[in-house]
UniProtKB/Swiss-Prot annotation:
Record protein name field: Antimicrobial peptide damicornin
Disulfide topology: C69-C105, C78-C99, C85-C103
Region annotated Disordered, chain positions: 37-62
Signal peptide region: 1-22
Keyword Secreted found: yes
Function: Cationic peptide with probable antimicrobial activity against coral pathogens. Shows in vitro activity against Gram-positive bacteria and the filamentous fungus F.oxysporum (MIC=1.25 uM). Gram-positive bacteria tested are B.megaterium (MIC=20 uM), S.aureus (MIC=5 uM), M. luteus (MIC=1.25 uM), B.stationis (MIC=10 uM), M.maritypicum (MIC=20 uM). Has no or little effect against Gram-negative bacteria (the coral pathogen V.coralliilyticus (MIC>20 uM), V.aesturianus (MIC>20 uM), V.shiloi (MIC>20 uM), and E.coli (MIC=10 uM)). Has no hemolytic activity against sheep erythrocytes.
Residues that make up the propeptide removed upon maturation: 23-67
Residue stretches of biased makeup (Low complexity): 47-61
Keywords: Amidation, Antibiotic, Antimicrobial, Cleavage on pair of basic residues, Cytoplasm, Disulfide bond, Fungicide, Immunity, Innate immunity, Secreted, Signal
Feature: compositional bias, Acidic residues: 37-46
Taxonomic path: Eukaryota, Metazoa, Cnidaria, Anthozoa, Hexacorallia
GO BP, one annotated term: defense response to fungus
Amino acid sequence: MKVLVILFGAMLVLMEFQKASAATLLEDFDDDDDLLDDGGDFDLEANSDASSGNGNDSNDAVPEKRRACADLRGKTFCRLFKSYCDKKGIRGRLMRDKCSYSCGCRG
């Protein structure tokens, strides 16, 4: 009986470790700026600089720029990792949760 309890506890610990490591892996991909090599950032910076004629406009452009970059990063991320959408297991579930809005993963 003790052996079963120990094995069950070890299994739970390994499952939690796998979830944590998969989540940190996905966070690293989400925050990686190397995925944005298509030059999209330069256009966004030019637009925010062009609208800085008034002092208030430049402050409003910063959140809009961040939102646009996040959308581009999400689409690029999902395009690269769409193969995980149909997989079973923790990575498939994380991918469906992460990018169901843009890459068509069905939950």
